[in-house]
Amino acid sequence: MTLSFHTGGYLMKTLIVVDMQTDFIDGALGSKEATKIVSNVVKKIKKYVKNGDRVIFTQDTHKKNYMKTREGKYLPVPHCIKGSDGWMIPSKIRNAAPEDTLVIEKPAFGYTGWKSILKADKDPVELIGLCTDICVVSNALAIKNTFPERDVAVDSSCCAGVSPASHDAALLTMKCCQIDILNEGKEPWRE
């Protein structure tokens, strides 16, 4: 399936790269599935940059008191502590986009400021990254709820979940909410 857009053209597509950080790739909460999507993510970012489209990174950002937070009680694994190596977006990924690319630090699964970032235009949005079943789905649904007429897609070949089963469940949830799923079944970690 290719990402299709409503007729009438658009000014610019936006790629949102969700939480592609060391702790989620091969750090505290990393997985073999996450490591296997990195090259697809880099290729996708470079394609958007080459086409003159917009790239935005999100960065899961916690404070040193993470273990005392609600999330820390339910997921007692310190991760993405601001300034730590695990919080960083690996240079291979970060350097695929221009230096002045917007990076949104978010303290929760979903970002609540999409309305001010994406404005009211109808340009399509595509999301990729980690974890499909937590932050990718949270942000895709937040964008779809804020902009119900906007084309929103997730490229599953550039995503990995906490587990393959939870990744698939998140894709189903997003499909039910009219979010287009691209490359389903073509995730590199399925090979």
Task: Annotate the PLM regions.
Residues D19, D133, S157:
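Acidic active-site catalytic centers that drive phospho-/nucleotidyl reactions
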Residues E126-L130, E149-P164, E184:
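A short glycine-rich beta-strand->turn/loop micro-motif centered on a GG-aromatic cluster
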